[in-house]
C-alpha cells in the first residue's frame, strides 16, 4: 500500500492496523474533499463492485452503495438469502465466483472474525476485499468516518480525551477506533459493564467509571448493546443499563460545551442514550451517517487507484 500522486492506493482494506498513519490521514482528507465537492469524479462504469452482506445492515450497506453509485461504478446485486449460500456454498467460493465473473471489488460483512484472511491470501481471487465488518473483529470504514467526524470538529486528535463506552468486548467499532486513536495521540478511556470488558483494552487506555471522567471529555463514543452476540444467559435491564452506563440527561448536562457525542448506530434509545439526546446539539450521530458516504467514496477510489497501479 502506498500514496500515489498524493492519493492513497490500496490493494485491500481489511483492518486499521494495516494502514499507515499517512494512509489514514489521506483517506480522511479525501473524504473531506468529496464532502466539499472539490473532486472531479472520473468515469468508473467499467468497474464492478459487489456488496456481499451476510449480516443485517442499513448504514454500512447503503452508504457503500450510495458511494459506489456516486463514483459511477456498476453495482452488482447480491442477496445472500437468494444465493447459493443457502445451498451450502462457502464464503470463499462465493467470492471466488464473483472474482471469476470479473468483479473488481467485494465489500463484505460477515459474522466470522477475520473471515478475510483466506480471501486476501488466495492466489486465485483477484477481486479486492473491503471489510464491511467481521464478527466482533474490526470495522475500518466506520472507524475512518468516525475520524473524519472528530477531525471536522477539533482539527486534531493529539491530546483529545475520548471515552469509548458500552459493549466493548463485542464491538468491532471499539477495536478499530482504539488502535488508530491511540496512534494519533488521543487519550482514551473505556467504561461499561465489567463482564463486557477485556484486559486487551488496557494497552490502549484506562477503564474508568463514567461519572469520574465525563466533565473532562472531548468525545463520548457510545456503543450499541449487541444482544445478538451475547450468549443469552446474562440478565439485562434496559433501565438499569441506562442509569449505570448510558448517557442520561443528567450526564449530558455535565459535558463540556465543546464536547461531542458519537454512536455508530443503530441506536437503542433510552439504553445507550436518552431518546431526547439522539439529535441534541452536542450529538454528531447524523453527521457520522452523512460522513460515511464520503469516506467510503475515498476508500473505493483508493482501491481503484491500487488496482490501476498494479495492472
Curated annotation (Swiss-Prot):
Q: Which Gene3D superfamilies match?
A: Aspartate/ornithine carbamoyltransferase
**Swiss-Prot/TrEMBL GO biological process terms:** 'de novo' pyrimidine nucleobase biosynthetic process; 'de novo' UMP biosynthetic process; amino acid metabolic process
Q: What GO molecular functions are on record for this protein?
A: amino acid binding; aspartate carbamoyltransferase activity
Q: Which family does it belong to?
A: Belongs to the aspartate/ornithine carbamoyltransferase superfamily. ATCase family.
Instruction: Give the matching NCBIfam families.
Output: asp_carb_tr, PRK00856.1
Record keywords, A-Z: Pyrimidine biosynthesis, Transferase
The superkingdom of the source organism is Bacteria
Q: What is the lineage of its organism?
A: Bacteria, Bacillati, Bacillota, Bacilli, Lactobacillales
SUPFAM superfamilies associated with the record: Aspartate/ornithine carbamoyltransferase
Stored InterPro entries: Asp/Orn_carbamoyltranf_P-bd (IPR006132), Asp/Orn_carbamoylTrfase (IPR006130), Asp/Orn_carbamoylTrfase_sf (IPR036901), Asp_carbamoyltransf (IPR002082), Asp_carbamoyltransf_Asp/Orn-bd (IPR006131)
Name by which UniProt lists this protein: Aspartate carbamoyltransferase catalytic subunit
What are its E.C. numbers?
Answer: 2.1.3.2
Q: What does this protein do?
A: Catalyzes the condensation of carbamoyl phosphate and aspartate to form carbamoyl aspartate and inorganic phosphate, the committed step in the de novo pyrimidine nucleotide biosynthesis pathway.
Q: Which GO terms describe its cellular component?
A: cytosol
Q: Does the keyword Transferase apply?
A: yes
**PROSITE patterns assigned:** CARBAMOYLTRANSFERASE (PS00097)
Tell me how this protein assembles. Answer: Heterododecamer (2C3:3R2) of six catalytic PyrB chains organized as two trimers (C3), and six regulatory PyrI chains organized as three dimers (R2).
Binding-site list for L-aspartate = 87, 172, 224
* Pathway entry: Pyrimidine metabolism; UMP biosynthesis via de novo pathway; (S)-dihydroorotate from bicarbonate: step 2/3
Give binding positions for carbamoyl phosphate.
Answer: 59-60, 109, 139, 142, 265-266
Q: Which reaction does it catalyse?
A: carbamoyl phosphate + L-aspartate = N-carbamoyl-L-aspartate + phosphate + H(+)
Looking at the keywords, is Transferase present?
Answer: yes
Q: Which HAMAP family match?
A: Asp_carb_tr (MF_00001)
Amino acid at each position: 500500500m502506498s500514496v500515489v500522486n498524493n492519493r492513497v492506493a490500496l490493494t485491500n482494506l481489511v483492518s486499521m492496523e494495516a494502514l499507515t498513519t499517512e494512509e489514514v490521514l489521506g483517506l480522511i482528507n479525501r473524504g473531506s474533499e468529496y464532502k466539499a465537492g472539490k473532486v472531479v469524479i472520473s468515469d468508473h462504469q467499467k468497474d464492478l463492485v459487489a456488496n456481499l452482506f451476510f449480516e443485517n445492515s442499513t448504514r454500512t450497506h447503503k452508504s457503500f452503495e450510495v458511494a459506489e453509485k456516486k463514483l459511477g461504478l456498476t453495482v452488482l446485486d447480491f442477496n445472500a438469502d437468494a444465493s447459493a449460500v443457502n445451498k451450502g456454498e462457502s464464503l470463499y467460493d462465493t467470492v471466488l465466483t464473483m472474482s471469476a465473473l470479473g468483479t473488481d471489488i467485494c465489500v463484505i460483512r460477515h459474522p466470522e472474525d477475520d473471515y478475510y484472511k483466506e480471501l486476501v491470501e488466495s492466489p486465485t481471487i483477484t477481486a479486492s476485499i473491503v471489510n464491511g465488518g467481521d464478527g466482533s473483529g474490526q470495522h475500518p470504514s466506520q472507524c475512518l468516518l468516525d475520524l473524519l467526524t472528530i477531525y471536522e470538529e477539533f482539527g486534531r486528535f493529539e491530546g483529545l480525551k475520548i471515552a469509548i463506552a458500552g459493549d466493548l468486548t463485542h464491538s468491532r467499532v471499539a477495536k478499530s477506533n482504539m488502535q488508530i486513536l491511540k496512534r494519533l495521540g488521543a487519550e482514551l478511556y473505556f467504561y461499561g459493564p465489567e463482564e463486557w470488558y477485556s484486559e486487551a483494552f488496557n494497552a490502549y487506555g484506562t477503564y474508568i467509571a463514567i461519572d469520574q471522567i465525563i466533565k473532562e471529555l472531548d468525545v463520548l463514543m457510545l456503543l450499541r448493546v449487541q444482544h445478538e452476540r451475547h450468549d443469552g444467559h446474562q440478565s439485562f435491564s434496559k433501565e438499569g443499563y441506562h442509569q449505570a452506563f448510558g448517557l442520561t440527561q443528567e450526564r449530558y448536562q455535565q459535558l463540556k460545551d465543546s464536547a461531542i457525542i458519537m454512536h455508530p448506530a443503530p441506536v437503542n434509545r433510552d439504553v445507550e442514550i436518552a431518546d431526547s439526546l439522539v439529535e441534541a446539539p452536542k450529538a454528531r450521530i447524523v453527521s457520522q451517517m452523512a460522513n460515511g458516504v464520503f469516506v467510503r467514496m475515498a476508500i473505493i477510489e483508493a482501491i481503484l487507484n491500487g488496482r490501476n497501479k498494479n495492472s
